[in-house]
A protein has these predicted regions:
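N-terminal secretory signal peptides that target proteins for export/translocation
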Residues: 1-3
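Bacterial N-terminal signal peptides
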Residues: 5-17
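N-terminus-centered regions that define maturation/targeting leaders and the start
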Residues: 19-177
Length: 177
């Protein structure tokens, strides 16, 4: 009973239990199809993304969007990287639809996707319905020495510095496939 009382008072005095970090989009829900406008068959613009629950002590955020089902979800051989952003400010709260490089929050570093260019590259699966993971990481550091890093370079730099992780998964299959 004493422990329960202690936990109650701790939660009350600290503002309640810590909220888990979450990422969401107004364009699609968890497990739902990604609208065509965000794909190679549409305007190829990034979806709006929103997050909350970034933990205290976080110094930067990393966003990675990738597809583990490439090239064929029945026999995946690789993970295709669609977007890499590092050093997003922790107070950002999200990104609007179709954000351009010049409009990214100050300090954000754009990494290379698997088309060997920076910026968002939307879903464009050659075969079948693929899953697209929008992964957000809260780090206890601002990553240094990055200039157009690959996903692998960002993941290596953030190793041991992840405070929290959230993900949103959407799907896409080309019309008539």
């Amino acid at each position: 009973m004493a422990m329960r009382n202690l936990l109650f008072w701790f939660a009350l005095l600290t503002g309640g239990p810590a909220m888990a970090m979450e990422i969401s989009s107004t364009a699609f829900g968890p497990g739902a199809p990604i609208p065509t406008r965000h794909t190679c068959e549409g305007n190829d613009v990034s979806p709006s993304l929103h997050w909350q629950g970034v933990p205290a002590g976080a110094k930067s955020l990393v966003l990675i969007v990738d597809d583990p089902d490439a090239p064929d979800p029945r026999a995946p051989r690789m993970t295709w990287v669609h977007w890499v952003l590092a050093n997003l400010p922790v107070d950002t709260g999200g990104l609007p639809e179709g954000i351009e490089t010049a409009a990214l929050p100050k300090g954000t570093v754009e990494g290379l996707n698997d088309w060997k260019r920076t910026g968002y590259g939307g879903p464009c699966p050659p075969i079948g319905r693929h899953r697209y993971f929008h992964k957000l990481y809260a780090l206890d550091v601002v990553l240094g020495g990055l200039k157009h890093p690959t996903k692998a370079q960002v993941e290596a730099a953030m190793k041991g510095h992840v405070l929290a992780h959230a993900e949103l998964v959407g799907t896409y299959e080309k019309a008539g496939r």
